[in-house]
């Protein structure tokens, strides 16, 4: 036991010494090298030992500048630094002559706004633009002497601009007038308006009296009833809208607008619904019915009604039956399709 303690003590001392040595070595390594340890110091030492002469000093001129234009550091007094000195002039660069700014005299006429100018030029631009450039260059030095001439010329141009603008407005009015009369012709509008009104009653009268009614029942399973709180959201999801005869109708438009395609009624008398009391309502089943002929494609309308009945039965766990309250099957489907074609 004592030998083990001795071994551990020796190992701990060795570890402490190693850590101290490593710390001193790291600190010494991070310190910057002195001038003696630098490589240039050794270079100068070797050069001195060989007896090589130091590089000759550079020659300086009378002003104290060497061949590279570098001179000795000079210390100036504060009074000297405050006195402004003229900038040095390079003799090799050409001195530009001082040009005094010339104030151009303003013309004694007012410029009209750009809105008074016409949209098109009265003269060809290829001939007018060079004359304007030469006229401006000639009149610039003698602007004061020709002020009256410029006033007359500007007045003539403004008058011509007003005349051109009036002509352009008259031409635009002549071009737009026939288009407006064609779009808003009272006689054509009065002739077409009664025709559109007369077409609607003809379409309604063409259906005539219903010759057949296609019926589908969605009934609850044996011993169960359909809850009104579940039926109402299903009706709204299937795009049915509460309306005439206190029942729900499926219209041409999903928003509840247009003609009625088919409807849903209560299977139990009196066959109506009360949307305000649907939570207290329960029934054995509901009836989908569609009259023939109907608006639009009868086959497409029946397909929508059949899919709606199946979707409702799946949502409320009910059963789809035909008009005789028999299970819906392929034979019944073919019979309904035959009745649709017969009344198309």
From Swiss-Prot:
Gene3D superfamilies: ZipA, C-terminal FtsZ-binding domain. Residues 28-344 are cytoplasmic. GO terms for biological process: division septum assembly; FtsZ-dependent cytokinesis. It comes from Shewanella oneidensis (strain ATCC 700550 / JCM 31522 / CIP 106686 / LMG 19005 / NCIMB 14063 / MR-1). The lineage of its organism: Bacteria, Pseudomonadati, Pseudomonadota, Gammaproteobacteria, Alteromonadales. Keywords: Cell cycle, Cell division, Cell inner membrane, Cell membrane, Membrane, Transmembrane, Transmembrane helix. InterPro entries: Cell_div_ZipA, ZipA_FtsZ-bd_C, ZipA_FtsZ-bd_C_sf. It is found in: Cell inner membrane. The keyword 4Fe-4S does not apply. SUPFAM superfamilies: Cell-division protein ZipA, C-terminal domain. This is Cell division protein ZipA. Belongs to the ZipA family. Residues 1-6 are periplasmic.
